[in-house]
Structures are given as structure tokens and as C-alpha cells.
Amino acid sequence: MKASQSFLATLKEAPSDAEVVSHKLMVRAGLIRKLSAGVYNYLPLGLKVIRKVENIIREEMNRAGAIELLMPMIQPAELWQETGRWEKMGPELLRIKDRHDRDFLIQPTSEEVVTDLARNEIKSYKQLPVNFYQIQTKFRDERRPRFGIMRGREFSMKDAYSFDRDTEGLKKSYQIMFDAYTRIFKRMGLQFRAVTADNGAIGGSGSQEFHVIADTGEDAIVYCPDSDYAANLEAAESLALIASRAAASVAMAKVPTPDKTNCADVAKFLNIPIESTVKSLLFVADQENGPAKLFMLLVRGDHELNEVKASKIPGMAESRFASEAEIKLACNAPAGYLGPVGVSADATVVADRTVANMADFVCGANDAGHHLTGVNWGRDLPEPLVLDIRNAVVGDPSPDGKGVVDICRGIEVGHVFQLGTRYSEAMGCTYLDQQGKAQPMVMGCYGIGVTRLLGAAIEQGHDEKGIIWPISMAPCEVVICPMGYEKSEAVKAACDQLHDGLLAAGVDVILDDRNERPGAMFADWGLIGAPFRVVIGDRGLVDSQVEFKGRTDAESQNIPLTQIKEKVIAAIQTTKQSIV
């Protein structure tokens, strides 16, 4: 391919609304152009990267036995009403009405549609297991689209859905998809981690996320360098940091702590470690019938509450922070001075594992301007309900017992779920077993953010010059840069011969035949991220030499013209082999 046929559209400056590196570089490199908030045109080079990503995904999904189909972007509301997600998903659904005033939506995902397909087409256990997948445009009406394609409203996604006879079958299908995802991201040349995750709005019994490791990632990944343990911060288990509770050594006392409303200030004022303080948080869970329920959650002063874990406490799924009036009623004190001693008997006290093993701790006294010191469980207040409700921190013991954890940042690009029978039971998706009895199909679902992968790869691979693509994703494998393509017959002939020879060998090559200065040409391809560059000019041809340079190489090499084709092919093959 020649550059004159590729519609190169590079820019010197990034758009003013671009916040992250990937957004800036994708616009500057001519991969995307913004149409409206969270909606983008993909220019030819950007589309070429998408097609390479899709091809890898499609090859591995087919290899794993999944069957490709295509489901409509527009879906009827009735299916989503069957599962309750029409109401639950709220404003994220882009809802539309047709001319007959019937409700539809633009799909954000397709569990309902594929379940409807399965219940109409699959009748017998003999037809199971089966796994359908599609690569299709999705839409989620994000409140605040940002970060370019990383958090857009319209995006491309590969979503797959497995149907099995039972849970054992689901586990096998799930593992097949997990292995396929691992191969996909390895082939793309990305540094990634598979982590234990929360199921979120899709539901189900178990899930794992695949994250591309990047300092700018939105998600915190808790992992153990000495083992394979990794989990999203929301789902990472936090063990008790104190092996067992010490005996009480002092009497409880109320002490003045004027204007000290957080644990750090209290610890400094009392000249004690912050690890000796306890943070008290009051929540309210409103009930449809009857009075609201109160929950006081306790974490150590230097720890943070994990709200996802808290939402799984029985009765707290729809809870909220208590208002000032509710705090006053339950504790007779303002926020900042709350504590479990003397709290309303209507409140359920839940202590994190570490707090449950603390002795002689400091907490709010439920009295403005005062805290309690020397507080002990059993003596000064009843034993609490003990649960894991905090965020993990660096240095925590790894839940698998193989060292301590660290935390890095990641960008979620894939998610696999064991859905179970949530959707099949809600929608009557059944099959007849060997005894002729109707059984609900057991489902799994598996997603990959196709367009998001472009942004994630750039966040992971870039420098001051531009994008550093993994070779399997790059818009080309090598670019040929002539010095005077239209001015020198010798240069033109050498470039054309190399271009045609590489094409015949199956190399993805671009010949930059534009009338551009060498510096501008080199800057463009450094920005776009061509993995390899060949420079051919009259000066080098005098000695039958050309320049060869890798995208991250400090210096170029002089290669004999007669050997450059083999050099390029060998470099590409070596690079590809290093990432598989």
C-alpha cells in the first residue's frame, strides 16, 4: 500500500479536550476524529488496527469452538422487561420509540436477545453445549463521556454467550473462554493480568476481568508478585492484619478531642499511631415495608471502606450514607465523633476483620468534641458481626498465603462471567434433559472491548514521539521512506521493488510516496507507530546501502540493498515470536 492511498491525517497538536495520552495520540496520529461527545469516526489507519484486533479475536474464538452470528443493535424493550433490566439499567440505556410508539433500545449488551434466541431454537440436551459470539457496535449513554474511546458512548465489542446443561458444563465452557482470552491478549503483545472481579450489573456467580497494565488505568489491581493471585480492588480479599486479639490493658476513658473529626487528626492530637484508631461509618438501608435499617461499619483509621463489599452485607444492597439528622438520631452526635459504644440498639455493628482483632482502640464517643480511648470488645461493647469490608493495601498478606500484595493500575479490556440461570430462569429458556424434563440452561457470558483495546495498547506503549504498537496491532509492520521518490528514478525503482517484494511475502508494508520533507515523514511515522522503518536515498544507493531502524531503536543500521527484504522479514518474525 502507498501512503497516497492511505489518507494520512496527522496533526501537530492534540485537541484541547483530550485528557489522556491515548486520546491525544489517536487524534494526532489520524486514527480517529470526534463526531460528538463519546462518538468517533475511525479513519482508515484506525480501522485497520480494529480489523487486526478483530481478526485475532475471531481466530481464537473459532479455535475455541464458538459460533459467530450477528444480533441486531436495536432490541425490543419487552425482552429487557422480562429480566428487569429495563428499569434497573436506568439512564445508561439509550431508549427509542418507533412510529407505533413501541419501546426499543440501542444494545449495550445482548444477554436478553441471545437468551430469546436460545429458548426458541434449542429444545434438547443433544443441542448443548453451544457458544455464540458476535463482534458488534454497542451503545451506553455515559453521563460524562471522556478519555476518548476509553469511555465513549458508542464502541465495538466482542460478546459471547455459552449455554450448558449444568454447572459442571458451564465451568468447562468458562475455562475454554478464559484460555481463549489468554491467547488473544498474548497474541496482541499486551502486558495483562486476569483478576478476580465483582459481577456488577450483569450478575452471576463468578467472574474475572482481563486488564492491560498501564499507569493511567482507572482500576486498581491487587496482585502478589510471588504467585498468580490477582484481583480487582473491589473484589480483593483483605485478611486480618492482627493474628489474634490482645487482652485489654487499660480502662476505657472519654477524652476531649476538640475539632478533631478524622482519624489522622485524632491520632496526632493523642500522640498515638493511626493504626490504633477506628473509623465509624453509619449507613441507612431504606425498606419498602417498615422502618429503615441502620448499619455502623468499622474500619481501622488508616484503611478505607470497600463499598462493593459493604453492599453485599445482608440488608445493605440498596443502602446509603446516613444524613446528618439520621446520625444525630442514632448517635446523638455529629459526624466525626461517631462510635460503636452506645450506638442505637437498632444499628447492626459490622467490624472489618482487622478491627475485630484490635484491643485498647480509639473511636468516637458519640459526643461532640470527644473520643473514647482504651475500648475493648466484649468488655465495653458487644462482639460485632465480623466481615471483610475494607480495601486491600500494599503489604497486606496475600490471600493465597504466598507472600504480600502490591497494587498496580489496569485498564479493563475483557470480562468473563459465570451467569448461571439468572437469565434463563427469568426468560423461560429451558431444554429437555434425558428424562424429558425441562431444565433451565446454564449460561456464561464473555466480553472484549474491541475499540477500547486500541486505547489501552497506546496507554501501555508510547513515548515522546508517539505510539509504540505491538506489531500484531500496528497499522503497518514496516514503512518505506524514500528520499525523493518522484525526483530520483533510482530511489523510486528501489522503493517499488522492495515494496512489491515485501507485499508478495505477506508483509504489511506502506510506501510513503508523499512529497514530504524527511523530518516530517519520520515524525509522522514515529507518531503513527510503524514498528520498522526503511529509508532509501540516492546517497546510500551509491554504496547500495539503505537505512533500517526499529521504532524503539536508538540508532539506525546500514543494510545492503540486496539484503534488506530478508532483514525486514526476519525482524518482523523475530518480534512476533517474542510476544507469543
Swiss-Prot record:
GO terms for cellular component: cytosol. Its EC number is 6.1.1.15. Transmembrane segments: none annotated. It comes from the Bacteria. Keywords: Aminoacyl-tRNA synthetase, ATP-binding, Cytoplasm, Ligase, Nucleotide-binding, Protein biosynthesis. GO terms for biological process: prolyl-tRNA aminoacylation. One of its GO terms (molecular function) is proline-tRNA ligase activity. The keyword ATP-binding applies. It is found in: Cytoplasm. It catalyses: tRNA(Pro) + L-proline + ATP = L-prolyl-tRNA(Pro) + AMP + diphosphate. PROSITE patterns: AA_TRNA_LIGASE_II. The keyword Chloroplast does not apply. It holds the Pfam family tRNA-synt_2b. Catalyzes the attachment of proline to tRNA(Pro) in a two-step reaction: proline is first activated by ATP to form Pro-AMP and then transferred to the acceptor end of tRNA(Pro). As ProRS can inadvertently accommodate and process non-cognate amino acids such as alanine and cysteine, to avoid such errors it has two additional distinct editing activities against alanine. One activity is designated as 'pretransfer' editing and involves the tRNA(Pro)-independent hydrolysis of activated Ala-AMP. Consists of three domains: the N-terminal catalytic domain, the editing domain and the C-terminal anticodon-binding domain. NCBIfam families: PRK09194.1, proS_fam_II. Belongs to the class-II aminoacyl-tRNA synthetase family. ProS type 1 subfamily. Homodimer. This is Proline--tRNA ligase. The gene is proS.
